[in-house]
Amino acid sequence: MLVFEILVVLAAIFLGVRLGGIAIGYAGGLGMIVLCLGLGLKPGSIPIDVILIIMSVIAAIAAMQVAGGLDYLVHLAEKLLRSQPKHITFLAPVVTYFMTLLAGTGHTAFSTLPVIAKVAKEQGVKPSVPLSIAVVASQIAITASPVSAAVVFMSGALEPLGVGYLQLLAICIPTTFIGCMITAFICNLFNTDLSKDPVYQERVAKGMVKLRGQTQYVAKPGAKLSVLIFLVGILAVVFYATAISKNVGLIQNPIVGRDSAIMMFMLTTATLIAMFAKIDTDAVLNASTFKSGMTACICVLGVAWLGDTFVSNHINDIKGFAGGILEGHPWMLAITLFFASMLLYSQAATAKALIPAAIALSVDPVTLIASFAAVSALFVLPTYPTLLAAVQMDDTGSTRIGKFVFNHPFIVPGVLAIGISVALGFIVAPILL
């Protein structure tokens, strides 16, 4: 029966992947019907906290986008990339990493990918190199963002173990960023000469490759103000979450918990942007970040609920099987999280499904934090939206998905970045805890 239940979970996930987009969440609901109504499993916990945090953060980001703030950030990113075009392989992941770090969602990378592709092409660099690292960096940065649902959940799970919110960020930010930079350095050592790519030459001969110059940017009246308001909102979240942590204790017995506070601050941020940037609030519903964020909520609802249902119904079996393995080989947790996130399609959903089980197995905080970056393996299956966008935006053909599905340019940078980040985590975490 256990094997059949696993097959049901995998079948639901693969059906969702095949249908694409929001259907990953839909298929999770189908899997729940089979597991609960068909096989008699008790429904697991719905990740309401994760979903509401994503909704709140996306509401603020979408308001900033409508105000022109996101375009302003992309303009700054383009200026940076064009100021040092020869270093595009290093600057591309820097841009997407920090945009995700600030926004709490990797969907902000959509806006920068066309710029990265253009600058790389103009420099004769295979766009696949900076694009692949940039996409991976935008996924890994989720595990270091102060306002991402994954980090907020992880912080809450670790607090009873004596690890504060600020400690978690102090470990995750440098280890993941350095991991991405080392990966960029390694990838830059390989052949990045676009002119020697046979597919590129073929596409040039057919007139399928176009060079575009720098786009003209005109800032909306409230663009800079919306960015400032959003940054102040993030700082407020970090300050409050730090102040209520047991390690700092500036606020004793807080009335509002961390999750609720983030929702309050982000919705307030959206309100202030709407008031002072004078945006059309109806336009928020059509913003690309709002649509992708709400899609993410449905996906998290479906796959995280499905995953938690399976795990919670077999937690004792999992403890018995995995306890001894993790005790002797703690790094195996990172591998488990890697493959789980590949299927669950969400950092927050993966953390929500497996971190409580790892804590129940008495996995130590160092291992938990060091392995956290491994929940970012969303690049393995070439169906994630930012990955597909990178493929579509590269008209040179260098960023392409092979016939065997897994042979695409995101695999090597992704595995390297996660592996290095996890290794650095095992070095840095014992020092800071």
UniProtKB/Swiss-Prot annotation:
User: Per the UniProt record, which residue ranges are transmembrane?
Assistant: 19-39, 50-70, 90-110, 133-153, 166-186, 225-245, 261-281, 292-312, 320-340, 368-388, 411-431
The family assignment reads: Belongs to the DcuA/DcuB transporter (TC 2.A.13.1) family.
- Write down the superkingdom of origin: Bacteria
Which Pfam families would you find in this protein's record?
DcuA_DcuB (PF03605)
What species is given as this protein's source? Wolinella succinogenes (strain ATCC 29543 / DSM 1740 / CCUG 13145 / JCM 31913 / LMG 7466 / NCTC 11488 / FDC 602W) (Vibrio succinogenes)
Q: Name one GO cellular component term.
A: plasma membrane
In Swiss-Prot or TrEMBL terms, this protein is called C4-dicarboxylate transporter DcuA
The UniProt GO MF terms for this protein read: C4-dicarboxylate transmembrane transporter activity
Q: Where in the cell is it found?
A: Cell inner membrane
UniProt topology in membrane: Multi-pass membrane protein
Q: What does this protein do?
A: Responsible for the transport of C4-dicarboxylates.
Q: Which UniProt keywords apply?
A: Cell inner membrane, Cell membrane, Membrane, Transmembrane, Transmembrane helix, Transport
